[in-house]
Amino acid sequence: MPSISPASDADRALVIGSGLGGLAAAMRLGAKGWRVTVIDKLDVPGGRGSSITQEGHRFDLGPTIVTVPQSLRDLWKTCGRDFDADVELKPIDPFYEVRWPDGSHFTVRQSTEAMKAEVARLSPGDVAGYEKFLKDSEKRYWFGYEDLGRRSMHKLWDLIKVLPTFGMMRADRSVYQHAALRVKDERLRMALSFHPLFIGGDPFNVTSMYILVSQLEKEFGVHYAIGGVAAIAAAMAKVIEGQGGSFRMNTEVDEILVEKGTATGVRLASGEVLRAGLVVSNADAGHTYMRLLRNHPRRRWTDAHVKSRRWSMGLFVWYFGTKGTKGMWPDVGHHTIVNAPRYKGLVEDIFLKGKLAKDMSLYIHRPSITDPTVAPEGDDTFYALSPVPHLKQAQPVDWQAVAEPYRESVLEVLEQSMPGIGERIGPSLVFTPETFRDRYLSPWGAGFSIEPRILQSAWFRPHNISEEVANLFLVGAGTHPGAGVPGVIGSAEVMAKLAPDAPRARREAEPAERLAAE
């Protein structure tokens, strides 16, 4: 098959995968003078942040909210653009409601006073402890997000320097342990500790550094992009094309090519070879090392080492539309979390035992409350997400056999909050861990790549600059700083600090630098 002309290789950068991390990487590389080509096996950019439309119902397939809009504004500014001119964000308040089987509920808002009132309503004796929790969260936000999360952690010395702060902040405690230290009510302990599930982590084992999410929500609020996260992905693609970048959709990369220890391009599944001066992989880090670099000897990220990591849970997601339901179930807002009778036991079944439990907790997304474009007039669009085991088990769940019975169980839970919903369901689509494995090439169908435990965070994660191959960079959920929209956008920011400017940009800068020196 033909290769790109060598004369054009040096200034070309290839980005494997058009998830939000890959798109952010492409934007930042374009700002550094690279001519970027983004390659993805899907038909539209966005990866998990893309959408599918059926019968007028648009289903946002992955992330549903934006918690740190400033990270996107900074990204656009780097490219000489205005994010708010390209994407409309709408604040959501309340952020979500947490419900328990006993009928009690906890409404999460941005206002500290409103939150303290909610805590007092549930458990008056826990208000003082909640205030301490907020202070703890703020400290970890400034260190864990604004500092650690925005710089590279690829050198061991980077880790050694921060160990005293980790110790001072008791990063050895889990998120749940820290919540339990501050409040006594088990419902509040759950409400203050479940956030790691949003990025694939077990609240009973993930480091307490992740309580910073409470401060993130308080600092920036929770926002919804009109048009869904897919609208953000589409806007990112337009910026890339405006920089002179291009896309190869419906195109799968089979291998990263390495010559004398340096990444020089990729071979596509079709056999075509694309050469480049720089390669960025937004594919899952496990897929990058085990599959795309399968023919290259690796020192650290061997197949055995990748397989030995703890992986995030899988996801069962049911996307569906309902007919004539606008205005029904007014107490079910944009986001609702419906808890199972068990918390710790269910989490252990998912993360430690690899067992598909009969009970379930659901994250219910009803974007039609906020965005009329997601459904036909008078209708609603939903998705219901249930955390489930990934496929890296001795006896993985056979989703071909159990997906439909499990969906029926999800419907039974939904009926408790929205009576009669089953009679009004229209278009329907189900994603299981097998879908994540096949559609997104996610190892073992994990929803969020490598789980963010303390010994799988920062330096311990696959680095943004590859340890195995020169000229290869990694972005996305499996790298530093981690999963979630702020995490993958941040991974591209870290990558850009490590990647060089394009050769042509350096050449163009030389005369100006000489004049300045004179």
From Swiss-Prot:
GO MF annotation terms: oxidoreductase activity, acting on the CH-CH group of donors
GO biological process, alphabetically ordered: carotenoid biosynthetic process
Gene3D superfamilies: FAD/NAD(P)-binding domain
Binding site for FAD: 14-47
E.C. code: 1.3.99.28
Catalytic activity as recorded in UniProt: 15-cis-phytoene + 3 A = all-trans-neurosporene + 3 AH2
PROSITE patterns xrefs: PHYTOENE_DH
Cofactor(s) in the UniProt record: FAD
Pfam families cross-referenced by the UniProt entry: Amino_oxidase
Keywords tagged on the record: Carotenoid biosynthesis, FAD, Flavoprotein, Oxidoreductase
Pathway: Carotenoid biosynthesis
Biological role: Converts phytoene into all-trans-neurosporene as the major product, via the intermediary of phytofluene and zeta-carotene, by the introduction of three double bonds.
Family the entry assigns: Belongs to the carotenoid/retinoid oxidoreductase family.
Listed name of the protein: Phytoene desaturase (neurosporene-forming)
Organism lineage: Bacteria, Pseudomonadati, Pseudomonadota, Alphaproteobacteria, Rhodobacterales
